[in-house]
Structures are given as structure tokens and as C-alpha cells.
């Protein structure tokens, strides 16, 4: 597989064992090595079962299964292949989390426990005790109305919608998957770095790890 051609925005990557990142001799470059499941200590039947499960709902565009740093299983929907571009959807949440971590390492953000209001003045209301950690943990306590995901999706400005979401419960008390949290994280990154999240993603994640075939 040519990693420069692989679009991480649509491919689901299942890490059956992530410990290879620590002290491993092999790390993928432009050509990611493949191997039989058995050579990596896993049965082919289990890999096939996992792949079949991911395609049951006809919504999966592609899946890659990695064991010990090598590809042991790979399949794409009929309308896609390893060169296809797709929509990342909620993968953005993982990218936001990584970018927040990088900003902390660079000293642009002091701590996960910083209150959001330290960076965003518009949180100086009943939301003032919400922290960056609460946003990342999906426990911000921001209101989560029925069909929130659909409501945000069809707004002209997703950020403006997220800014308007009201306080509902104490932060850190309940996990509630809420897209508004991620939009607020993007705004924090902009204030801390003076760069939009898509630019940060390109500069700090995609280019450094060699991903060249993408659309933002």
C-alpha cells in the first residue's frame, strides 16, 4: 500500500495492537508492509469476521486492519478504493485532541484544565467553569437537544451555532457526545495559535507524517 495515496479521511484503521509503536524496529513509510494474519499471531478467520462486520450496514467506505505495525486485512466498498477521497466526519475530534496536545507541548495552551473562558470571552457566562478537558471528554455539560447533530450540520456557520449552545448541567458529570464541543476546541486553537484548525492539521500532523493526498 502506498501511504501517500492512502486517504486517512475515509479509511477506518483498526489497531489490534498498538504496542508496536514503543520500541518497534519497523514504522511504515510510503509503502506500508502487508503480511498474513497468521504471521502476526492472529487467525485469518477473525480478520475476515471483523471486516465483514464493518460492512454490514453498507455505510463503511473502507477498512484497514493493522497488527504489529503491518497490514493484515484491507477492504473497500465497491465505490471506493485506496485512492478514493471521502469525508472524515468525527475523525476530526481525534485530530482536535492531537492538536490540543501539540499546542500544550509548544506552550501555546497551558493545560487541559484551563477554563475555556481563558481563551474565549464568550464563555464568560454560566459556562465559565467548563475546561478544555471537559470538551475533550465530551462532558462539558453543554445542552444537547434532540437531533443536535442534524441541526448543526445544516447551519451556515457551525461555529456560530456552537457558540450559542447553552449550559445545561455541571461539567465533568456526564458523558454526552456533542459536536459543539469540537467546534469550541477549534476556536480555542485559533485563539492560542492564530491559525485555523485546518492549517494546523496540515502543518503539524499531515505533512510531518507524510500524508500528501488529502482535501481540507
Which sequence ranges carry the predicted segments?
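Active-site helix/loop module of the DD-peptidase/beta-lactamase fold
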Residues: 106-140, 164, 193-216
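Active-site SXXK
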Residues: 69, 86-112, 135, 185-189
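A short, well-structured edge-of-sheet supersecondary motif
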Residues: 50-80
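Short, compositionally biased leader-like segments
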Residues: 24-43
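Bacterial N-terminal signal peptides that target proteins for export
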Residues: 1-10
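Catalytic-site signature segments of enzymes, centered on catalytic residues
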Residues: 145-216
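Extended ligand-binding groove/face enriched in aromatic
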Residues: 87, 100, 122-168
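Bacterial N-terminal signal peptides
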Residues: 10-18
Amino acid at each position: 500500500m502506498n501511504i501517500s495515496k492512502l486517504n486517512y479521511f475515509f479509511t477506518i484503521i483498526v489497531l489490534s495492537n498498538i504496542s508496536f509503536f514503543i520500541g518497534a524496529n519497523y514504522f511504515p513509510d510510503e509503502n506500508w508492509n502487508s503480511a498474513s494474519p497468521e504471521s502476526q499471531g492472529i487467525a485469518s478467520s477473525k480478520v475476515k469476521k471483523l471486516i465483514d462486520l464493518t460492512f454490514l450496514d453498507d455505510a463503511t467506505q473502507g477498512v484497514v486492519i493493522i497488527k504489529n505495525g503491518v497490514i493484515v486485512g484491507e477492504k473497500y466498498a465497491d465505490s471506493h478504493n485506496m485512492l478514493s477521497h471521502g469525508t472524515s466526519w468525527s475523525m476530526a475530534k481525534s485530530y482536535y485532541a492531537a492538536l490540543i496536545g501539540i499546542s500544550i507541548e509548544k506552550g501555546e495552551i497551558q493545560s487541559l484544565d484551563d477554563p475555556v473562558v481563558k481563551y474565549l470571552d464568550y464563555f464568560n457566562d454560566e459556562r465559565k467553569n467548563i475546561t478544555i478537558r471537559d470538551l475533550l471528554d465530551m462532558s462539558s455539560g453543554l445542552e444537547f437537544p434532540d437531533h443536535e447533530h442534524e441541526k448543526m450540520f445544516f447551519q451556515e456557520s457551525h461555529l456560530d451555532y456552537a457558540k450559542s449552545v447553552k449550559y445545561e448541567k455541571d461539567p465533568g458529570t456526564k458523558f454526552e457526545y456533542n459536536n459543539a464541543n469540537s467546534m469550541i476546541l477549534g476556536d480555542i486553537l485559533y485563539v492560542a495559535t492564530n491559525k485555523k484548525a485546518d492549517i494546523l492539521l496540515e502543518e503539524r500532523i499531515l505533512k510531518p507524517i507524510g500524508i500528501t493526498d488529502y482535501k481540507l
